[in-house]
Amino acid sequence: ALPISVIHCDMDDVMLIILPLDHCFAHVAGFYTMMSYGGSIATVPVGKTAMATLKNIPIAIREVRPHVMLSVPALARNFRKSIEAGIKAKGPKVEKLYNFALNNAIAYNREYWNRGGWQNAWRYPLVKLFDRLIFKAVRENFGGRMKFFVGGGALLDIALQRYFCAIGMPMFQGYGLSEATPIICSNSFEGAIFGSSGRIVSPMELKICDAEGNIVPDGERGEIVIKGENVMAGYWKNPESTAATIVD
């Protein structure tokens, strides 16, 4: 399976990985993806403690000025808190203008795939104006070159997805697991819907089945079943778990 089928970068892009490097998500979505594009990779310096490493993240962002970052929802929430604390410190007038700009952009973006439209055409000039007046300065705190985040590891709530898209740094949610090396699907600029996990990587087959292995009708819950070269060969020296997981 090819992560580049859902994670699109340019040769001149720099990716900052702020996730543990001993996990296959950082390897595949980070190192191997950027190697495929001929791009550059940066990591956060490890501190003497976990807290020291976290404090190195904003320093690394300022130094690297990344185009893309691998992140998790917990860090994204902290980024938002930091941004809004900075806005609040500028006074009530700036905060009120910021909130108006944010709500206008969220309304314009709708569910991302259907953003804009004739009903929201009047919002577009305001989106561009406030992007230059407010959100451009916000993005400067992330180096001024950020295109998007790739988020994983936990559910990314829709409010956060709407927020980062509104300020011009979309955080695209993906889904996967280590047994699938590890990307199954992801949103991207080419195809995103807030609240979804995006398109599956190519080449890979996916279906949603019931307990008996039958494909469930659209709209019904079931188990995600995948098939492809990205699926693991099995668990190390654990044939019982392998037999229970690898069905076909």
Question: Model-predicted segments: where are they?
Answer:
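Conserved short hydrophobic patches within well-ordered secondary structure
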Residues: 1, 24-25, 178, 184
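Conserved AMP-binding/adenylation subdomain of ANL enzymes
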Residues: 3-14, 21-124, 128-135
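Short, well-ordered beta-strand segments
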Residues: 14-16, 224-225
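Extended hydrophobic secondary-structure segments that form protein cores and membrane-embedded regions
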Residues: 15-18, 149
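Conserved AMP-binding/adenylate-forming
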Residues: 106, 123-248
